Amino acid sequence: MFLCRVPLSCKEPVKMYWNKSDTNHCTVVAVGFKEVGVDIEYMRYRRFEDISRRYFHKDEITDNMHTFYELWCKKEAYTKWKKGKIAKYMSQKIDKDMTQLVPQSRYQMTELDGLPYNIRGYLCY
């Protein structure tokens, strides 16, 4: 894979960050000048209540497909942004607006638009 066919010339090296996620024949690559984390998931029926009971905070247990994938994608994008372990952040409750996992962390969470109707995704930066 080439990002550029012509080598870039600059006096100082440019620090770039990237992250990728793929699901069901769909791939997203996020590139930026600071840390990024991205996650997309193909939404299909699962036993959401059982899965959320096992992995999410007790207040986040849900049987709703859209809520489940929203929480899952946000937590996974955040984990990738932090370069952390998924088990550590999946069980942490996110705030009312579902944007902040760890209050002292400074980041932004954005829902990805333009994805197929059955794929949900979030970008953390």
Model-derived features: where do they sit?
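Conserved nucleotide-ligand handling architecture
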Residues: M1-Y125
